[in-house]
Amino acid sequence: MCGIVGYIGHREPSKIVIDGLRRLEYRGYDSAGIAVHHNQNGIDVTRAVGAVDKLDLLFSQKVTDEEARIAIGHTRWATHGVPAERNAHPHMSMRGTISLVHNGIIENYETLKKKLVSEGYEFKSDTDTEVLANWIEFHYHNIYSEGDHDLALAVRLALKDVVGAYAILVIDSHTQQIVAARKSSPLAIGIGSDEFVIASDATPIIEYTRDIVYLEDGQMAIIELHSQMNGGNPDVTFINLDNEVINPEIEHVDMELDQIEKGGFDTFMLKEIHEQSETVWNCLRGRLTDGEEPLMMGGVENVLPQLLRANKIFIIACGTSWHAGLIGKTMIETLTRVPVEVDYASEFRYRNPIIKPGDVVISISQSGETADTKAAM
């Protein structure tokens, strides 16, 4: 499950966004990225495969605009396209006008992409998110042809064409705004006295404010940073996709960070037990679609031929990952009739298993750092 963080206000935005992404690491990810709005110098994007610390290192090597006040960031689990820098968020539109981070799945992205290709658009990634960034830009430039940089209108028009689930943050190179919108994917707006922090959940927000709006489906937030002549502080307008102004409830969050991370439960175990149905749904939502490709195999395309030709599959893991492997064994054998063996990684590495040409070994590790599993591989 991906993570989103955005900031607009008087502090250094890149630090708040990167620190916020660290707070969301528990959600899991394979790559991370940040886009910073450099006032008159456009939008700068930094992306990295691997840990948020790697992103932080890459970003620290850049010369940044000390006057920047807007940034958006993202941690990604691959669904459309392999884990690679080109597929990481934020995505830029072809003309460099729009930058976007997105959680969810755009089910009709192929239809939108064909339309964009017919309009001369080219794509650098394998993702549905880049399609959405360009679809917003397509509307944005149609609006600008009439003399207006109306980012919120472009987002509204684009989303009316979208089928699927999304939580998005959008910035453009011409205005000092973040536009946020959601459908079937969580998004929280933290409201400070002179700043706003936007995130997938409250964990990156509560250090800066305890007043939070949780967007509902079909709602948008337009957060604009005013010029110094107009006070220099940001404000927010909440609307729906029909451009009707709404007044959502502002919740004051009293829970501490560890309580928020536990979702109100006493332990992480209870939280994870109660989240199972939602977690399974989120996993499937990124893999199963009604499009021309009903099964999305993002992250494993490079080894898909070997998987399809497998004579036998070995799954190695530890702890709860081992239990997940047992479920995988049942499903794989039922659906494919390929035999599967599930082993504890700590035993697999010592027992000299019989692995023949054409067999496939799959390791499972929630953290990616389980020592026995890495040693067994």
Report the location of each language-model feature.
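Glycine-rich phosphate-binding loops that contact phosphosugars or nucleotide phosphates
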Residues: 305-377
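Conserved short alpha-helical segments that host acidic/polar catalytic motifs at enzyme active sites
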Residues: 1-262, 266, 275, 281-311
